[in-house]
Amino acid sequence: VIIGFFSNSYGDIENTNNTNTNETSAYYDVNDIPDYSGEAYITINNNVPYFNENDYTTKSFETYSELDVLGRCGVAYANICKEIMPTQERGDISDVKPTGWKQKKYNGEYLYNRCHLIGHQLAGEDANELNLITGTRYFNVTGMLPFENKVAEYIQDNPNNHVLYRVTPIFKGDNLVANGVEMEAYSVEDKGKNVCFNVFVYNIQPGINIDYSTGESSKK
């Protein structure tokens, strides 16, 4: 398994196409993302990921961006396969405090989770600060988890296959909390027949106002 790190430079445009360089290629502006309207996610680019032919490989790898100058996570990119999936229970991640971590309870439940960009069930990463962002329960469970499960179930059913998987946190300006993430996936051996998606998942919590610049929150 190859595990790598690459530098990340953030601007107003937050989609990185070439994960082997520091160049950023914009497909949409964060300001063009429509406001949350009741659905946990929207599709991007007709649900087709932005991978190119050079990305398709059957070699396993994991790549995580360095934290930027504000301490924020960048693109996380992997070729998910049985080889890199965890073989033991998830470890403790409570020592990691991602940017914007201003935890509060509402109705007896914590607002924020430490959200894996590449889910633990896919790559076995525990307290990797390059892979954890501040996200709401709704974002984590209702938004990201169904897509993670789709990839995990495909690999479980096809243990010799691979899924290219990239998660890009989308920050507006210098905000410390991401507005959401772009999730892209493509099953390599069957050329996307069983897994192929490109979605933006909203980092919101119904009934709660979030100040994305700081992580502070309040009831609506």
List each model region and its residues.
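Hydrophobic membrane-insertion alpha-helices, especially the h-region
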Residues: 1-7
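Domain-level detector of nuclease and nuclease-like folds
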Residues: 51-220
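N-terminal, intrinsically disordered, polar/charged segments of Gram-positive cell-envelope systems
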Residues: 9-60
